[in-house]
Curated annotation (Swiss-Prot):
Species the sequence originates in: Bothrops jararacussu
GO biological process entries: blood vessel diameter maintenance; regulation of blood pressure
Propeptide segment residues: 24-30, 41-47, 61-67, 78-84, 96-102, 114-116, 122, 128-144
Signal sequence region: 1-23
Residues with Pyrrolidone carboxylic acid modification: Q31, Q48, Q68, Q85, Q103, Q117, Q123
GO cellular component terms, A-Z: cytosol; extracellular region
Impact upon substituting P76A: Important decrease in ability to enhance AsS activity
Domain of life: Eukaryota
Principal location listed in the UniProt entry: secreted
Protein's recorded name: Bradykinin-potentiating and C-type natriuretic peptides isoform 2
Family, similarity comment: In the N-terminal section; belongs to the bradykinin-potentiating peptide family.
Residue ranges of the region described as Disordered: 81-110
Transmembrane parts of this sequence: none
Subcellular location per the Swiss-Prot or TrEMBL entry: Secreted; Cytoplasm, Cytosol
């Protein structure tokens, strides 16, 4: 969705940059095209009124012809619409049993509360290891 809008705005920006304010192309060589002469499209010729247009004649849509005069018999309204304003066809539906006992007592015994959690006993940690005292070494011999 965002990409399509971004692409559309980019194409619009390119189209606006290609035309100047007066509607003529910005490029100077647009009046004298340096390439070969390209004839106008046939679609543009007959779209401006050059009838008959090329190709076989396309008849008007049949949907447009019979949309005003529907060829099929009249479709009756839905039965849902008929009984939605009054009583529905068929026997009445009793209320749900859940609604019946939800206002009174439930049909089963109450659920007992969960037992309290018993915590594990506190573990005593091992005593902290005491390090051996720092050993004193003999002084280093000095060269004489």
């Amino acid at each position: 969705m965002v990409l399509s809008r971004l692409a559309a705005s980019g194409l619009l920006l390119l189209a606006l940059l290609a035309l100047s304010v007066d509607g003529k192309p910005v490029q100077q060589w647009a009046q004298s095209w340096p390439g070969p002469n390209i004839p106008q499209l046939l679609v543009q010729q007959w779209a401006q009124g050059g009838w008959p247009r090329p190709g076989p004649e396309i008849p008007p849509l049949t949907v447009q012809q019979w949309a005003q005069n529907w060829p099929h018999p009249q479709i009756p309204p839905l039965t849902v619409q008929q009984w939605a304003q009054g009583r529905p066809p068929g026997p009445p539906i009793p209320p749900l049993t859940v609604q019946q006992w939800a206002q009174a007592r439930p049909p089963h015994p109450p659920i007992p509360p969960a037992p309290l959690q018993k915590w594990a006993p506190v573990q005593k940690w091992a005593p902290v290891q005491k390090w051996a005292p720092v050993q004193k070494w003999a002084p280093l011999l000095q060269p004489t």
